[in-house]
């Protein structure tokens, strides 16, 4: 990552990569919807209760240490989901080509666990996202972007819908819509 090479070399930034369980949970059509949502919630708990504290411990919890999340596609979902639900733990997020409407994967039936895992749904409810903390956040603490190229349609729709919903609720986010040359493909 040449864009942040200097920050990495100076020790100002560290990168951690968390493997996901999307194949076992969210994308596993052989499991009931509730079980898939439970696995997503367990992964969220792992990120927030184990990985993030471990990152802070590795840095001796230096004052001012901030954790940002970033991801592409379902990684964007996880990154933004963590920021929305735990904004006091995660200082910011960058979601690139993200899917935020999980009904695409598990249908429209909903219960408390399914709701808890679906940003476009839970932001319309109270008690799941920390809305007061999100409303105080700076705009550039949540960056949403999507392209207009091949295979980017669902991500573009969800990214725009999430940005609109956040704006309507007074929660700042920075939206970037990239051109038709930005596709939803592996070489990115």
Regions found by a protein language model. Name each.
Residues 1-188:
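Non-catalytic cap/lid and distal C-terminal segments of serine-dependent acyl enzymes
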């Amino acid at each position: 990552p040449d864009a942040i090479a200097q920050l990495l070399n100076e020790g100002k930034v560290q990168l951690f990569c968390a493997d996901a369980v999307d194949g076992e949970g969210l994308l596993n059509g052989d499991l009931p919807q509730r079980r898939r949502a439970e696995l997503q919630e367990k992964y969220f708990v792992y990120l927030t209760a184990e990985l993030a504290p471990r990152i802070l411990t590795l840095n001796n919890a230096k004052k001012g240490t901030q954790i940002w999340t970033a991801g592409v596609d379902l990684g964007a979902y996880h990154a933004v989901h963590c920021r929305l639900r735990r904004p006091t733990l995660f200082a910011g997020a960058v979601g690139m080509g993200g899917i935020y409407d999980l009904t695409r994967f598990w249908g429209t039936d909903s219960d408390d666990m399914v709701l808890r895992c679906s940003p476009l749904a839970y932001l319309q409810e109270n008690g799941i996202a920390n809305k007061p903390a999100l409303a105080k956040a700076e705009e550039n603490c949540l960056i949403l972007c999507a392209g207009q190229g091949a295979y980017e349609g669902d991500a573009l729709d969800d990214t725009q819908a999430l940005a609109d919903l956040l704006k309507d609720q007074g929660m700042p986010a920075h939206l970037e819509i990239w051109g038709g040359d930005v596709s939803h493909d592996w070489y990115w």
